[in-house]
Amino acid sequence: MARLPILLLLISLVYSTPSPQTSKKIGDDATLSCNRNNTNDYVVMSAWYKEPNSIILLAAKSDVLYFDNYTKDKISYDSPYDDLVTTITIKSLTARDAGTYVCAFFMTSPTNDTDKVDYEEYSTELIVNTDSESTIDIILSGSTHSPETSSEKPEDIDNLNCSSVFEIATPEPITDNVEDHTDTVTYTSDSINTVSASSGESTTDETPEPITDKEEDHTVTDTVSYTTVSTSSGIVTTKSTTDDADLYDTYNDNDTVPSTTVGCSTTSISNYKTKDFVEIFGITALIILSAVAIFCITYYIYNKRSRKYKTENKV
């Protein structure tokens, strides 16, 4: 007979009704509610807590008391007193809000004079989805170019006078507090495998010849830069003139330009503090008191001797 209660307990655990689940996303609001089965008794108090040991609120009549750093801004209690349903709303869900929430009813019979309180509780599981999906749209664009053929004969190509102009930008030297410079060099080549035909079409060889740098086609411009240095004694502006030829040489050489240093001096003025005056006053007062004490002692001794001398003369 002792095995029967154990068997019934195991059966109730196996076939118990699972807790309802609510699934929400991060940032959403979740509304949790539960109904009580005992509709005849009088509700004394209802409560909500989160497993394992976190009390959210206690509600009695029109008063709601929050615990464990929960506030009405985070969790609102939306149930009228002594209703069959108790409801809370969790706002702006985060990953920490996920878990099992339990509601409880504390009830008493209105016709019973005893202090017996019945208890019912129901649980619901809140799932907060933290997985986010993102879609990346990649658009690829391009064009194909098929080389055009020319009907020109090799001997005709050699007789043509062809020229091409190219514009190449050399790398910019790295400088501090100097305006950006771009050295533009124009090159002219008398021998290149590009032919201009009468029809406007062009034919390009697959392996063009290297382009040589010619010094006579360089275009040199002068650049004036201003460097402003702010110090505690004022603002110093330095004007410097730099031409692109010098910049080109600076880029190719490993020489560095020495920087200009602007120095300034700061004069510190010390003021006497209240503490210093107190110390001076204390020392002066001590000297005066010492002098007064010495005077009093001397006067006392002198007066005592005078009285003694007068007494001896009277006798």
UniProtKB/Swiss-Prot annotation:
The keyword Phosphoprotein does not apply. It is a single-pass type I membrane protein. SMART domains: IG. Glycans are attached at N37, N69, N112, N161, N254. Residues 17-279 are virion surface. Induction: Expressed in the early phase of the viral replicative cycle. Residues 304-315 are intravirion. Glycosylated; contains phosphate and sulfate-substituted glycans. O-glycosylation is required for hemagglutination and hemadsorption activities of infected cell membranes. Residues 17-121 form the Ig-like V-type domain. Residues 192-202 have a biased composition (Polar residues). Keywords: Disulfide bond, Early protein, Glycoprotein, Hemagglutinin, Host membrane, Immunoglobulin domain, Late protein, Membrane, Signal, Transmembrane, Transmembrane helix, Viral envelope protein, Virion. It holds the Pfam family V-set. SUPFAM superfamilies: Immunoglobulin. One of its GO terms (cellular component) is viral envelope. The keyword Transcription does not apply. The chain crosses the membrane at residues 280-303. Residues 1-16 form the signal peptide. It is found in: Virion membrane; Host membrane. Disulfide bonds join C34-C103. Residues 192-214 are annotated as: Disordered. Belongs to the orthopoxvirus OPG185 family. Heterodimerizes with OPG040. The heterodimer OPG185-OPG040 interacts with components of the entry fusion complex OPG143 and OPG094. Heterodimer with C3/VPC protein; disulfide-linked. Prevents cell to cell fusion by interacting with and directing the viral OPG040 protein on the host plasma membrane. The OPG185-OPG040 complex associates with components of the entry fusion complex (EFC) presumably to avoid superinfection and syncytium formation. Via its interaction with C3/VCP protein, protects the infected cell and probably also the extracellular enveloped virus from complement attack. This is Protein OPG185. It comes from Vaccinia virus (strain Tian Tan) (VACV).
